[in-house]
Design a protein with these regions (language model features):
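Glycine-rich phosphate-binding loop signature in dinucleotide/nucleotide-binding domains
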Residues: 58-63, 135-136, 173
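ATP-binding N-terminal substructure of ATP-dependent carboxylate-amine bond-forming enzymes
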Residues: 1-93
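Short acidic-hydrophobic, aromatic-tinged amphipathic segments that line or gate anion-handling sites
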Residues: 43-53, 121-125, 155-157
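Active-site "cap" helix and flanking loop/linker of ATP-utilizing ligase/carboxylase catalytic domains
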Residues: 232-255, 271-330
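A conserved helix-loop-beta module that forms one wall/lid of the active-site cleft
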Residues: 90-153, 159
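Peripheral (often C-terminal) accessory segments that flank ATP-dependent C-N-forming ligase machineries
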Residues: 295-387
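Internal nucleotide-binding/catalytic subdomain
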Residues: 152-275
Length: 387
């Protein structure tokens, strides 16, 4: 199959490599400014937001399936144009994806559908936001509304701190902000694949972050089958049904940042596609053919083709470290390894989380600075104490 991946982010490169590993017969093309450094794909020098040129490339080169990881391409309507042309594509319509780009839209929809989310306020004027903060119980969270690549989210414990934070957010050119109550539990991350009507869970992840590093562990033992069913029934399916009425449906991968509150959940925000280095975690555990899954969702036949997504009976542990902290990078290891412009990412899988974690941390100790290794150990120790 001729496959075009629209994106030049880490997920795009990982996806191309993973597809080729699973089935070397695929011809893979990737939109990137870089010259080809990997035999798994052919580079196509088209800008991600130049959707008409991408469409022409697909037409004239008889591309059979397109996968968009690029946020720029999605917000510029690549799925809308491809659907009109009759080209198979795995990506949400631009209007549907707005719930992942604009937190204010996500919050309003959750409020309308009675989906659990922290109490919030949406403001486009600093004086009104300041008055809301003055009457709030602390701590609170202040974040910018628009999120293309990352959302700035800051926790404030006092009014004076929040006042300065508000000034900074509005001075940075944000036209709208979201203020919400802070929930004193660790965030968890859940990803679903959907064809716009049905959805299946892909992976659950716990994350710890610190100076120059982040650590991810999957699956999360905090997200039980009962919680997953609740999220599907009370959040995902009502959301998909609502989106289908005004935006044509959401086909793609939708991520949730959630916090658990007693025996239920609260959704903080939605993600379009995998965030951080979570795709690497997913591929380390999945036993499914990735092209088959995505193509099934793109065709609207997810429920017909899959009852669930098959995973290994393993645990995955991922460490992302700033390149400045790496002393001796060994390419020939048993770990899944990747890199972006700033970080090296290492993933290990094993039959138990303890084994996956200890083996990888031994490796991190050998190849990274003592400082970052110590910070990782301290962060993991604190997490265990909280448990």
């Amino acid at each position: 199959m001729k496959i075009l991946i629209v994106g030049s982010d880490l997920n795009a490169f990982l996806l191309a490599k993973y597809i080729k590993i699973q089935d070397s017969s695929h011809d893979i093309y990737l939109t990137t400014e870089e010259t080809c450094v990997d035999e798994s794909y052919t580079p196509i020098h088209i800008r991600e937001n130049d959707v008409p040129s991408i469409c022409d490339f697909v037409k004239y080169n008889q591309i059979e399936f397109t996968i968009a990881t690029s946020q720029l391409a999605i917000i510029n309507g690549i799925a809308d144009i491809f659907k009109k042309e009759g080209f198979p594509i795995f990506a949400p319509f631009s209007e549907a994806a707005r719930i992942t780009f604009f937190n204010s839209i996500a919050k309003k929809i959750m409020y309308k559908l009675k989906i659990n989310t922290p109490k919030f306020g949406i403001f486009d004027r600093e004086n009104l936001a300041l008055e809301y903060v003055r009457r709030s119980r602390f701590p609170i969270v202040i974040e910018n509304d628009f999120n293309l690549l990352s959302r700035e989210s800051t926790i404030y414990k006092t009014y004076s701190e929040a006042k300065l934070g508000l000034q900074k957010v509005f001075e940075n050119g944000n036209e709208k902000i979201v203020i919400e109550n802070y929930i004193e539990t660790e965030p968890l991350y859940i990803y679903f694949i959907t064809d716009g009507f049905n959805a299946l869970p892909l992976v659950t992840i716990e994350r710890t972050s610190g100076e120059n590093f982040s650590v991810s562990a999957s699956p999360s033992n905090k997200i039980t089958e009962n919680i997953l069913v609740k999220i599907l029934k009370q959040a995902i399916y009502p959301l998909l049904d609502d989106i289908s009425k005004f935006a044509g449906g959401y086909t793609g991968i939708i991520g949730l940042k959630v916090k658990l509150v007693k025996d239920t959940f609260a959704i903080l925000e939605f993600y379009n596609g995998f965030q951080y280095y979570d795709f690497q975690t997913f591929i380390s555990l999945s036993e499914e053919n990735i092209v088959d899954i995505l193509y099934s969702a793109a065709n609207g036949s997810l429920a017909d083709d899959y009852d669930f997504i098959q995973h290994k009976e393993d645990f995955s542990y991922t460490v992302a470290v700033n390149k400045t902290e790496v002393l001796d990078y060994l390419e020939d290891t048993d770990f899944i390894q990747s890199e972006d412009s700033e970080k090296l990412i290492f993933t290990n899988t094993a039959s138990t989380m303890t084994y996956a974690k200890n083996i990888l941390l031994d490796y991190i100790q050998d190849v990274c600075t003592k400082d970052v290794y110590s910070r990782i150990i301290q962060a993991e120790s604190k997490k265990e104490l909280r448990i």
